[in-house]
């Protein structure tokens, strides 16, 4: 608080895949809860992604021999196979406790077009065919791990798909001939498709989803002093319709990180399920931030005359300060003053239902600037105030604003005799409200980021204040390129 200072399923699935076991026995300072609505959205987005990937499948040519009593022996070949259309309809994404996620797709269809050749002795015939694949079901488990950089890894396991209905339509001069052994041909086409679908899913997870997960932040900078640690503290807690993902959420000094000795209290999350995702942020995160700021001297402030508005009725020199303490003018004629404000201890954020507030305790020491440029202390004052905090969440970060009550001032020590505390209190409140707090609010407006992967945006935000933690509900949108 310085015055005149400064500092394939790429979607909500990205959040789900943060659920990797890490340090055991540590309470998180941030929890992300994904509801059944969020899982449903992730499955829907994943379905669109897989559907696009299906069009990229390259189907191999295949051939075989046939023998028909009335015709004799011959060879056939199917080539230039291309997927013309595909419809992936029903899908579900469910937690797989202790392992990861389970994706199921049902009631889907694929249309394939290609060409055929038949050869018997010196006779060669050719034509085209259409293949309608119906009642396709796909299931795959997504197993989660973690790499040395503390980012999640994902591998596809147990992929299976079944085609229950397949119809081959052959055109050409001897289409009737191929229809005589269509069961054999359909069986081969079915095996090719089933193999290629799982191969496509494996490739999509390896080439698309895994690199996407590398965009998830492990740490993020808040300002020139603070950073936040988004590493994970435990395995996901899978329930009937939700999945809780637990982050360390630890605020630290970017220039000198030290271990946090105060344990984070347990957060009892409400059973809300109206929105896709909920963020629970412990008051511990905010209190560590104020402690780091305090240790770095960032909460201290200095007031000099050149920092006051030009039209201010009060100047920081001994002549103008005579109404506060008459003796100062006689003892230190025509000298400038400097006020140094220090916060006695790191203020704690009071988080209770409907209330966010701070009660910082400060001391202000007045110095006379001597002709030698040395400073001489002439008075010390104690200052207490209540500051209410409002937080705002946008689609990627948390921002704040302070709303202070009037500061109360008491005299601790005066080396210049009588001191008009009430007059100084009025001056201090004017300065705090018009200079100091606006500067602080400008810094708070920069906010700190939420742990979101690329192209994820939040909307329909719902902010709640509970005992010892803040709770933000939101719906999610994946922003396609």
UniProtKB/Swiss-Prot annotation:
Q: Which cysteines are joined by disulfide bonds?
A: 159-198
CDD domains the record matches: BPI1 (cd00025), BPI2 (cd00026)
Signal sequence span is 1-25
Example GO biological process: cellular response to lipopolysaccharide
What molecular function does GO assign, one term? lipopolysaccharide binding
> Do you know which PROSITE patterns this protein is assigned to?
LBP_BPI_CETP
Glycosyltransferase as a keyword of this entry, yes or no, is no
Q: Which UniProt keywords apply?
A: Antibiotic, Antimicrobial, Disulfide bond, Glycoprotein, Immunity, Innate immunity, Lipid transport, Membrane, Secreted, Signal, Transport
Record carries keyword Disulfide bond: yes
* Glycosylation (residues): 300, 355
UniProt GO cellular component terms: cell surface; extracellular space; membrane
Transmembrane region(s): none
Q: Which InterPro entries match?
A: Bactericidal_perm-incr_a/b_dom (IPR017943), BPI/LBP (IPR030675), BPI/LBP/Plunc (IPR032942), Lipid-bd_serum_glycop_C (IPR001124), Lipid-bd_serum_glycop_CS (IPR017954), Lipid-bd_serum_glycop_N (IPR017942)
Question: What is the tissue localization of expression for this protein?
Answer: Detected in lung, liver, heart and kidney.
Task: Give the matching Gene3D superfamilies.
Answer: Bactericidal permeability-increasing protein, domain 1, Bactericidal permeability-increasing protein, domain 2
Q: Where on the tree of life does the source sit, at the highest rank?
A: Eukaryota
Compartments, record wording? Secreted; Cytoplasmic granule membrane
Read off the Pfam families from this record: LBP_BPI_CETP, LBP_BPI_CETP_C
Which protein family is it in? Answer: Belongs to the BPI/LBP/Plunc superfamily. BPI/LBP family.
Q: How does it assemble?
A: When bound to LPS, interacts (via C-terminus) with soluble and membrane-bound CD14.
Record function comment: Plays a role in the innate immune response. Binds to the lipid A moiety of bacterial lipopolysaccharides (LPS), a glycolipid present in the outer membrane of all Gram-negative bacteria. Acts as an affinity enhancer for CD14, facilitating its association with LPS. Promotes the release of cytokines in response to bacterial lipopolysaccharide.
What is the protein name stated in its UniProt record?
Lipopolysaccharide-binding protein
What's the name of its gene? Lbp
